[in-house]
UniProtKB/Swiss-Prot annotation:
Name the record gives this protein: Beta-catenin-like protein 1
Organism: Bos taurus
UniProt-annotated stretches for the region Disordered: 1-49
Keyword rRNA-binding: no
Gene coding for it: CTNNBL1
Lineage summary: Eukaryota, Metazoa, Chordata, Craniata, Vertebrata
Comp. bias regions, Basic and acidic residues: 34-45
């Protein structure tokens, strides 16, 4: 290595961390040349530094002058220049590989070629500004060559490749050229990019800042590709990413940006994906999530970022509980006990714990969890939350409506699934203290009935205007209106009316009389409640088998006979 090489050095255009001065630039060059061999060849490096220091002023003048000339003479990026760049990359990659094979124990022999390889990788960042030319990366086999370098012996090279791939797959860039994005994504998926990235992740040391950045950029590649092509999430999880994410989450390391990013990517992989949910369960992922969340049962997150990670983990857990097999794992892992404890501790985690319990107990698959919840004295926890919505919930981003929605859904699930002694214990709660819980139920009923009636009036006005303009109200528009009504409060109201029907069919005269008494006092009618429950029954069972849908509708409508 000589002064000529230093003169020919081009700044790292792709790096996200600009260097402050020439001295820092030289240090970075030495690190990229061979971090792992630094100890053995420190003497040679010192010689280079001395040469640089001797000619520092002259070097800076020449570099500044050449930089100005380059700006003036720089050619616009086109197919020809990209092809030339890719050819240079292939040559330098091959040369470095050849020298490493020829001189495996003499880094000074291949150090220069590694510098050259790193330089051209940095120059290739400019291709990310022209996604229309991505097809050249595929046609000239550059993508496969880049993927091959993910396993390079020098992690500095693999990190440089990861940084480049992250920029090439930036979601905003991908949307600029759908065709170019498709070609690049196909090539990356065909080359099993995630499997190679995971292998690279396994050897990175996050105590080294550059390698920690490499981990972050790797996760960004996965996020970018998952957003552009959601179906690749299943393959990504099966190629070892899900297992690595779980391992990284439970690693005994201080909270950092990478742990937050891991929680985000995990939530993405599990979204609407039963295969990944099942795989997580098989990898003991439910236990990992519960262990990580247990930290927040008595302590609030210390930062906004840590709170975001906590919410991501809760979202992942809720997503997994959509699968019945994971509800069994949740039960065995004492997830109910943890969530119940969080409800009692009144920390920030309480709102999310309530959502988890809702997911764990809903539907016939939640029967075992419902019974266990009563056994661990969960009724003592849930009914105070039913009687009064906490004042502090707005501070943690949860609305009063969301809180009441989850509580009412849990009570509806308990009434649906409980049998025997546990059901009796639940019904007795509605007779305590002069039926105060029935009074609260009716208070919520009128609150949400009013909200839904306001929404219905607005929707009817919109329908009238559409008819007047000659527009057709098709099924899609009707579905949209129904979703708006659900969001306005119909979803909560349906659960409230279902609870009313269940407790009035419980052969407890005191409860039934109180419900009818309050309805009459408010000038309301059983007909309104029946209409709401019928509408609820008609729309139940979405995504389930026709047999379940039919039997559930019959069961719900049967409740109206004795209401």
């Amino acid at each position: 290595m000589d002064v000529g090489e230093l003169l020919s050095y081009q700044p790292n255009r792709g790096t996200k961390r600009p260097r402050d001065d020439e001295e820092e630039e030289l240090k970075m060059r030495r690190r990229q040349a061979g971090t792992r061999e630094r100890g053995r060849y420190r003497e040679e490096e010192m010689t280079v530094v001395e040469e640089a220091d001797d000619d520092k002023k002259r070097l800076l003048q020449i570099i500044d002058r050449e930089g100005e000339e380059e700006e003036e003479e720089e050619e616009p990026l086109d197919e020809s220049s990209v092809k030339k760049m890719i050819l240079t990359f292939e040559k330098r990659s091959y040369k470095n590989q050849e020298l490493r094979i020829k001189f495996p124990d003499n880094p000074e022999k291949f150090m220069e070629s590694e510098l050259d390889l790193n330089d051209i990788i940095q120059e290739m960042h400019v291709v990310a500004t022209m996604p229309d030319l991505y097809h050249l990366l595929v046609e000239l086999n550059a993508v496969q060559s880049l993927l091959g370098l993910l396993g390079h012996d020098n992690t500095d090279v693999s990190i440089a490749v990861v940084d480049l791939l992250q920029e090439l797959t930036d979601i905003d860039t991908l949307h600029e050229s759908e065709e170019g994005a498709e070609v690049l994504t196909d090539a990356l998926v065909d080359g099993q990019v995630v499997a190679l990235l995971v292998q690279d992740l396994e050897r990175l040391d996050e105590s080294v800042k550059e390698e920690a950045d490499g981990v972050h950029n790797t996760l960004a590649i996965v996020e970018n590709m998952a957003e552009f092509r959601p179906e690749m999430c299943t393959e990504a999880a099966q190629q070892g990413l899900l297992q690595w994410l779980l391992k990284r989450l439970k690693a005994k390391m201080p909270f950092d940006a990478n742990k937050l990013y891991c929680s985000e990517v995990l939530a993405i992989l599990l979204q609407d994906n039963d295969e990944n949910r099942e795989l997580l369960g098989e990898l003991d992922g439910i236990d990992v999530l519960l262990q990580q969340l247990s930290v927040f049962k008595r302590h609030n997150p210390s930062t906004a970022e840590e709170q975001e990670m906590m919410e991501n983990l809760f979202d992942s857990l809720c997503s997994c509980l959509m699968l019945s097999s994971n509800r069994e794992r949740f039960l065995k892992g004492e997830g109910l006990q943890l969530m119940n404890l969080m409800l009692r501790e009144k920390k920030i985690s309480r709102s999310s714990a309530l959502k988890v319990l809702d997911h764990a107990m809903i539907g016939p698959e939640g029967t075992d969890n419902c019974h266990k919840f009563v056994d661990i004295l969960g009724l003592r926890t849930i009914f105070p939350l039913f009687m009064k919505s906490p004042r502090k919930i707005k501070k943690v981003g949860t609305t009063e409506k969301e809180h009441e929605e989850h509580v009412c859904s849990i009570l509806a699930s308990l009434l649906r699934n409980l049998r025997g002694q546990q059901r009796t214990r639940l019904l007795n709660k509605f007779t305590e203290n002069d039926s105060e819980k029935v009074d609260r139920l009716m208070e919520l009923h009128f609150k949400y009935l009013d909200a839904v009636q306001v929404a219905d009036k607005k929707i009817e006005g919109e329908k009238h205007d559409m008819v007047r303009r000659g527009e057709i109200i098709d099924n899609d528009i009707e579905d949209e209106f129904y979703l708006r009504r659900l969001d306005a409060g119909l979803f909560v109201l349906q659960h409230i009316c279902y609870i009313m029907a269940e407790i009035c069919n419980a052969n407890v005269p005191q409860i039934r009389q109180r419900v009818h008494q309050i309805l009459n006092m408010r000038g309301s009618s059983i007909k309104i409640v029946r209409h709401i429950i019928k509408e609820y029954a008609e729309n139940i069972g979405d995504g389930r088998s026709p047999e379940f849908r039919e039997s559930e509708q019959k069961r719900i409508l049967a409740l109206l006979e004795n209401f």
